[in-house]
């Protein structure tokens, strides 16, 4: 298997599982009870992260974080999906942190580099929106202050 085939395309992440598919993963997870296998936990977390529901995505990130801690052999995959899950939740700083850890493991991985760029682009966009909002608030405040001061002069 080539390195670039190891992780899915980023476009695939945006296509959620059907309710039926997620239900199958959920049932497998619940049926294993107290002894849920690493693969089942990973699969369920993966399905949850692909969900459109924020609660599902949050649970997916929590499960993956535990798999990451418990199973060193799955860390690379976990980091990738932790980055994606955090990105989808709007937690861009965490997403970048996970992606950076992944790139430390495999600095030449094109999918991880692409994911890192997507995260950086989103952070830059969010930063520009924040600057625009602050600028707008300052402009409105200055206009109000100017109006108040001009009223006092009359």
From Swiss-Prot:
It is found in: Mitochondrion outer membrane. The chain crosses the membrane at residues 129-149. Residues 150-154 are mitochondrial intermembrane. One of its GO terms (cellular component) is peroxisomal membrane. It is a single-pass membrane protein. One of its GO terms (biological process) is peroxisome fission. One of its GO terms (molecular function) is molecular adaptor activity. TPR repeats lie at residues 76-109. Residues 1-128 are cytoplasmic. Gene3D superfamilies: Tetratricopeptide repeat domain. Keywords: Membrane, Mitochondrion, Mitochondrion outer membrane, Repeat, TPR repeat, Transmembrane, Transmembrane helix. InterPro entries: Fis1 (IPR016543), Fis1_cytosol (IPR033745), Fis1_TPR_C (IPR028061), Fis1_TPR_N (IPR028058), TPR-like_helical_dom_sf (IPR011990). Its main location: mitochondrion. Has a role in mitochondrial fission. Has a role in outer membrane fission but not matrix separation. The C-terminus is required for mitochondrial localization, while the N-terminus is necessary for mitochondrial fission. PANTHER family: MITOCHONDRIAL FISSION 1 PROTEIN, TETRATRICOPEPTIDE REPEAT PROTEIN 11 TPR REPEAT PROTEIN 11. Belongs to the FIS1 family. This is Mitochondrial fission 1 protein. It comes from Yarrowia lipolytica (strain CLIB 122 / E 150).
